Amino acid sequence: MEKKFLTDFKEILEMENEEIHLSDNFREYEKWDSLAYLSLIAMMDEEFGVQIEGNEFKKLITLNDLINAINAKKIDGGN
């Protein structure tokens, strides 16, 4: 799941040839913007069947936080 997420995330930000780390603050990437945010939310729903609300999303800092949130939501039924 982690590899799929990172691959999809890199595609969203057009960073396929760049190295990223789970500890990275994803909001600090140069191409992070509102369109990337919407694309990420859509990808998490389509690929992993989870929905993360805005207030919850604001608390997520790193790529690892995103992965942990997806895993927690999958256990909790997606919502």
Regions found by a protein language model. Give the residues of each.
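Phosphopantetheine carrier-protein modules
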Residues: 12-31, 48-59
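C-terminal structural segments of small proteins and small subunits
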Residues: 51-78
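Two-component histidine kinase catalytic core, primarily the HATPase_c
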Residues: 36
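Thiotemplate assembly-line natural product biosynthesis machinery
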Residues: 1-19, 72-79
